[in-house]
Amino acid sequence: MKSFYGILCVAVLMMFHLEMSESRSNFQMLLEDPDYLSLEKRCLNVGQKCTPGNNKCCHTYICSSLDSKCFYR
């Protein structure tokens, strides 16, 4: 029975290691992407200028057609 728990523990540790190495490579890919931090790719927060009809506001924010700024709906 102890060997079963040992094998199970090793399997869980290997899965955790693989998951961490995959997320690390995805993070590295994001850092190497030159467009990742550009304004075109980033979403806009409340009060930032936006273009109505081209909603690039974050989350549940929308672009106001009155003052062309993101606001919470």
Swiss-Prot record:
Disulfide connectivity? C43-C58, C50-C63, C57-C70
Q: Supply the alphabetized keyword list.
A: Disulfide bond, Knottin, Nematocyst, Neurotoxin, Secreted, Signal, Toxin
Q: What does this protein do?
A: Putative neurotoxin.
Tissue-level expression reads: Expressed outside of acontia.
Q: Where in the cell is it found?
A: Secreted; Nematocyst
**Could you confirm whether the keyword Signal appears in this record?**
yes
Organism in which the protein naturally occurs: Calliactis polypus
Lineage top rank: taxon: Eukaryota
Relay the domain remarks.
The presence of a 'disulfide through disulfide knot' structurally defines this protein as a knottin.
UniProt key word Aminoacyl-tRNA synthetase: no
Q: Where is the signal peptide?
A: 1-23
Return the protein name: Putative neurotoxin NaH-Cpp1a
